[in-house]
Amino acid sequence: VIALLMALAATTTPAKPPVVVHKAPIFIQTNAVDPVGTALVRKLCDALDTSTLYRPVTNPADAQYVVGIVTMDPDDAAVGTGAGRSTVASVTLQLENTKGLNHFIYSWVLVANQDKIDTLAEQLFGAIDREIQDLNAQVAR
């Protein structure tokens, strides 16, 4: 029995240590008061929550990147039933700088109807990821 255990121990490969994936911390800074803009921000936060590359943080000083989002209803001043069906959003991607102003990376201006926010949030998250990956590739050179 001892010989069998020794033979098994000699042929068994040791377990590999788990691979630790660093998830870049992102802070979402938002001013979305219109219902469609609020829903867009919520969908973007959902994408961040389930990301394998990024993680949300609640304190901007803990972030590596800051995504700033301001939304408004373009029909807010309209008379009638047009309000509440779309949003206009200004989005910025910034590199967090705890010693002063953040470093600007990229910006987007978006217009979305209520029925398009799922798609828009996915596309925006993909665009943010592409800009971060591009920045990382440039820094690595």
Walk through the language-model features, giving the residues of each:
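Bacterial N-terminal signal peptides
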Residues: 1-9
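A structural "domain/chain start" motif
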Residues: 8-51, 133-141
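C-terminal/domain-edge helix-coil "capping" segments
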Residues: 16-20, 96-141
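Surface-exposed acidic, glycine-flexible loop patches that form ligand/cofactor-binding
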Residues: 17-19, 56-59
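Solvent-exposed loop and beta-edge segments used for protein-protein assembly and interaction
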Residues: 20-22, 61, 85
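Hydrophobic beta-strand residues in large extracellular and virion-surface proteins
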Residues: 26-28, 67, 89-93, 124, ...
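Surface-exposed short loop/turn segments
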Residues: 50-56, 63-115
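A generic structural signal for ordered secondary structure
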Residues: 59-61, 127
